[in-house]
Regions:
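Conserved N-terminal segment of class I S-adenosyl-L-methionine
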Residues: 1-95, 99, 116
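Glycine-rich loops and low-complexity Gly/Arg-rich segments
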Residues: 59-62, 80-81, 107-108, 126, ...
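Active-site micro-motifs of SAM-dependent methyltransferase domains
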Residues: 89, 107, 138
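A short beta-strand submotif of the Rossmann-like class I SAM-dependent methyltransferase core
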Residues: 102-105
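S-adenosyl-L-methionine-dependent methyltransferase catalytic module, highlighting the catalytic core
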Residues: 110-118, 128-167
Length: 167
């Protein structure tokens, strides 16, 4: 259920991510936020609700299209820019950002050893980067909840089975 997932992301960001970031960096309507791997934009909503200037980037055009549809009616949508592009190839990011969000995405980014040094170019001098990832050893660490198969999507620990079990 995509709406349920969107809401979970939004609520988690509002209740946990923003308070965590605010211990290190105040968030105001003047804050410029970049989310890398924004998907349909669940993590973006709480920042947009606060009036922040938000940019979301994702390589998946379908998810960006859904995010554009979702946010077309948001009262602060003039503060939102959504970009479909590979972060390593993006040419549209000209601003420096106060906060960069990388939530449950870094495990999908190629060349991870180059990634954090690369994205520093988008960070303002006193900006912060928030990185969170699903622990592989948790029941749904393999993202099986997004499987189309109803049984497999609810099967915890499925991703830890030996490779031959997938054939």
């Amino acid at each position: 259920d995509r709406q349920l997932y969107f809401n979970e992301q939004s609520i988690t960001t509002q209740k946990y991510v923003i308070p965590f970031i605010e211990k290190h960096k105040p968030i105001t309507a003047d804050s410029h936020i970049l989310e890398i791997g924004c998907g349909e934009g669940g993590n973006i909503k709480p920042f947009l609700d606060l009036g922040c200037k938000v940019t979301g980037i994702d390589i998946n055009g379908g998810q960006i299209a859904i995010a554009k549809e979702i946010y077309s009616v948001h009262p602060n949508n003039r503060n939102l820019t959504l970009i479909c592009e590979d972060i390593y190839k993006v040419t549209e990011l000209h601003n420096k950002f106060d906060i960069i969000i990388i939530r449950d995405v870094i495990e999908h980014i190629p060349n991870q050893e180059l990634f954090l040094p690369f994205i520093k170019r988008f960070l303002s001098p006193h900006g912060v980067i928030f990185v969170a990832f699903p622990p592989w050893q948790n029941p749904f660490g393999g993202h099986q909840q997004i499987c189309n198969n109803k049984l497999l999507s609810h099967l915890p620990w499925f991703h830890l089975l030996p490779r031959p079990a997938y054939k």
